């Protein structure tokens, strides 16, 4: 189980100040992050260390991360909001 302190910290780190990222990351950390396994939680925290401009390109699907694991997390976040 994820502690409230950790979730609150991640919530604030997920708020990037760029609306396009905020609408993806904030709901993800609230709704999905608590149910992730430890590996994916670490991966999400690593994603948050990336530059906003890089993440913007990845989430707008203009580019892909050179790191396959980070790209997998990007895809996981996008898959929850895109119609199937």
From Swiss-Prot:
Annotated localization: Cytoplasm
Keywords, sorted A to Z: Chaperone, Cytoplasm
Disulfide bonds: none
Pfam families recorded: Sdh5 (PF03937)
GO CC terms, sorted: cytoplasm
Listed SUPFAM superfamilies: YgfY-like
Entry-linked Gene3D superfamilies: Flavinator of succinate dehydrogenase (1.10.150.250)
Domain of life: Bacteria
Gene Ontology biological process terms in this record: succinate metabolic process
Chaperone recorded as keyword: yes
InterPro entries registered for this protein in UniProt: SDH (IPR005631), SDH_sf (IPR036714), SdhE_FAD_assembly_factor (IPR050531)
Function: An FAD assembly protein, which accelerates covalent attachment of the cofactor into other proteins. Plays an essential role in the assembly of succinate dehydrogenase (SDH, respiratory complex II), an enzyme complex that is a component of both the tricarboxylic acid cycle and the electron transport chain, and which couples the oxidation of succinate to fumarate with the reduction of ubiquinone (coenzyme Q) to ubiquinol. Required for flavinylation (covalent attachment of FAD) of the flavoprotein subunit SdhA of SDH and other flavinylated proteins as well.
Family: Belongs to the SdhE FAD assembly factor family.
Protein's name in the database: FAD assembly factor SdhE
Designated gene of the protein: sdhE
């Amino acid at each position: 189980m994820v502690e409230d302190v950790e979730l609150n910290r991640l919530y604030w780190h997920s708020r990037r100040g760029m609306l396009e990222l905020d609408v993806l990351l904030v709901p993800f950390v609230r709704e999905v992050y608590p149910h992730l396994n430890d590996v994916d939680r670490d991966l999400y925290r690593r994603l948050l260390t990336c530059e906003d401009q890089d993440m913007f390109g990845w989430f707008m699907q203009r580019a892909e991360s050179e790191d396959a694991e980070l790209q997998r997390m990007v895809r996981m976040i996008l898959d929850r909001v895109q119609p199937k």
